[in-house]
Design a protein with these regions (language model features):
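A short glycine-rich, Lys/Arg-flanked "PGG" loop and its adjoining helix->strand segment in the class I
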Residues: 198-210
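A short SAM/SAH-binding and catalytic strip from SAM-dependent methyltransferases
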Residues: 179-198
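Conserved class I S-adenosyl-L-methionine
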Residues: 106-115
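Conserved SAM-binding loop of SAM-dependent methyltransferases across substrates and taxa
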Residues: 116-128
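N-terminal auxiliary segments of SAM/dcSAM-dependent transferases
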Residues: 17-63, 70
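Class I SAM-dependent methyltransferase Rossmann-like catalytic core
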Residues: 57-66, 71-103
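Class I SAM-dependent methyltransferase SAM/SAH-binding core
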Residues: 129-167
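Conserved beta-strand signature within the Rossmann-like core of class I S-adenosyl-L-methionine
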Residues: 207-220
Length: 251
């Protein structure tokens, strides 16, 4: 969930617990000359064509997230205007005890759209999952983040998966079927149409089983000026992030 107000006073911080060097864009580790590795290339052209030829032309937000797009979004979340990240962090921190009590230790934490893994990592000290499964469409970026995270939690199994979970969720047999907790923060559910969101939540419900749980972040109604500032920032990061979608799909 996210508060209906802008939230706590913004303070610049280094997202934890990833090493700071992951936040510096470096051409030497950018694999974005290729489309996001988690996208099935065989179906991408047909999906893009169908969206662009629709009565309301659209492109799925998943195409925002190649390596460069993931780094741009990471930087965007630190902007003063971008309230969702810090507000949601504050809500989770304020309710951590009740979240932990409801879930209990030793669950398998499955982080959908994990990015740099920083949001889920804040849950580790209290939730103490036995396994962490970050999932993201930008495989190279995700694997770099997971590799930096593993030494900090040597007793926890970290299994990064680069895949597109927007239409189906096929988890490998190495992911225990019991005590699955799906974590989907950031109000990303808003990227789906109502019908798509319903189908997506049903898939999560089926995947988490009878002893699992879903932690879902959803933004509330905001003043137009707040949204305008958050999604059309003064330094142009959101613009660069969105334009990178064209760069990605044109490859």
């Amino acid at each position: 969930p996210a508060s209906s107000s802008i939230g706590p006073t913004y303070q610049r911080y280094a997202p934890m617990p990833i090493q700071p060097d992951i936040y510096t864009y470096n051409n030497s580790d950018d694999t974005s000359s290729e489309p996001a590795a988690g996208i099935a290339q065989s179906g991408a052209a047909a999906e893009l064509a169908a969206g662009l030829l629709d009565d309301k032309a659209h492109v799925s937000p998943k195409y925002l997230y190649d390596t460069l797009g993931s780094k741009l979004f990471e930087a965007l979340c630190l902007l003063p205007e971008y309230y969702p990240t810090r507000t949601e962090d504050a809500i989770v921190a304020a309710n951590m005890a009740s979240i932990t009590q409801a879930m209990g230790p030793d669950a398998t934490l499955i982080d959908l759209g994990a990015g740099n893994c920083a949001k889920a990592a804040r849950l580790f000290p209290m939730l103490q999952p036995r396994q962490y499964v970050p999932i993201d469409i930008s495989r190279d970026f995700l694997e770099q983040a997971a590799a930096q995270l593993q030494p900090r939690y040597p007793h926890m199994r970290i299994t990064p998966l680069g895949l597109d979970f927007s239409h189906k969720l096929d988890l490998p047999a190495s992911i225990p079927a019991e005590r699955r907790v799906f974590f989907y923060p950031g109000s990303s559910i808003g990227n789906f149409s109502p019908d798509q969101a319903s189908a997506f939540l049903r898939r999560l419900r089926n995947a988490c089983g009878t002893d699992g749980a879903i932690v879902l972040g959803v933004d509330l109604i905001k003043d137009a000026a707040v949204l305008q500032a958050a999604y059309d920032d003064a330094v142009g990061l959101t613009s660069a992030f969105n334009l990178n979608l064209l760069r990605n799909v044109n490859r």
